A protein has these predicted regions:
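Beta-propeller blade termini and top-face loops
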Residues: 1-187
C-alpha cells in the first residue's frame, strides 16, 4: 500500500510508502507525567481507517483513549463514552462490511483486571454497547472480521481464540493449548 500510518503519542501518515511521514494529530494520549513510571506508556496501540471513506480514522491508546477523525486528522474527537475507563485499547477495527460499524477491544491487565471487554458502535464510535458475552475472564488482545462472512468475528485473548457468531462468543478448539493470542491472521 502507498499509505502507511504510524502511531506514537501522535498519529503520523506517509503518502509515499514510508519515505516521508507527517503528523496528522495532536497528542492523542492522556499525557499524564504522573503515570509515566519506569516503563513509559501513553502511546497509540491501534489504528484503523474505514474502508468506506479515506480519512475516517480510529485511533486507540494504551491509556484508554479512543479518538476518531472524519477529515484525515484536521479535527479529532474523543469517543470513549460507553467503554471501560482507562483500559488499554488493544484493538480498534472499522468494519469492512458495514459503514459506520466499529469494534473496540480493551485490556485491563495493567490494572490487574482480567475481564474481557469488547464494544461495538454502529455510529462511528459516537455510542458503544458491550458485546462481551461468552468470553471467559481473559483480556482481549485482537479482534478480526471474517473476510467472507459478516456475522463472524475472531477474538484473540490471553486464553486462546474465540469465534463470535452474531455477537455471541463460542470457544473454539483449534488444537492448541490455552495461550495468549496477539496476532490473528484471518485469510
Amino acid at each position: 500500500p502507498r499509505i502507511i500510518y504510524h502511531g506514537m503519542n501522535r498519529l503520523f501518515r506517509s503518502m509515499d510508502r514510508g519515505e516521508n511521514f507527517a503528523p496528522i494529530s495532536p497528542d492523542l494520549t492522556r499525557n499524564d507525567p504522573d503515570e509515566l513510571g519506569d516503563i513509559p506508556f501513553q502511546t497509540i496501540t491501534s489504528i484503523s481507517e474505514s474502508p468506506f471513506e479515506f480519512g475516517r480514522i480510529f485511533v486507540g491508546t494504551d491509556d484508554g483513549r479512543l479518538h476518531r477523525t472524519f477529515d484525515s486528522g484536521k479535527t479529532w474527537e474523543l469517543i470513549t463514552y460507553g467503554l471501560q475507563e482507562e483500559r488499554w485499547i488493544s484493538r480498534v477495527i472499522a468494519s469492512r462490511w458495514t459503514d459506520g460499524v466499529v469494534y473496540a477491544a480493551q485490556n485491563g491487565k495493567r490494572w490487574d483486571d482480567l475481564d474481557a471487554y469488547r464494544g461495538k458502535s454502529e455510529e462511528n464510535g459516537a455510542t458503544w454497547r458491550s458485546i462481551e458475552d461468552g468470553i471467559p475472564g481473559a483480556p482481549i488482545n485482537v479482534v478480526r472480521e471474517d473476510p467472507k462472512n459478516a456475522d463472524l468475528l475472531y477474538v484473540g485473548t490471553d486464553l486462546g481464540v474465540y469465534i463470535s457468531v452474531d455477537e455471541v462468543s463460542l470457544a473454539v478448539d483449534i488444537g492448541l493449548l490455552p495461550l495468549k493470542v496477539t496476532v490473528l491472521p484471518v485469510l
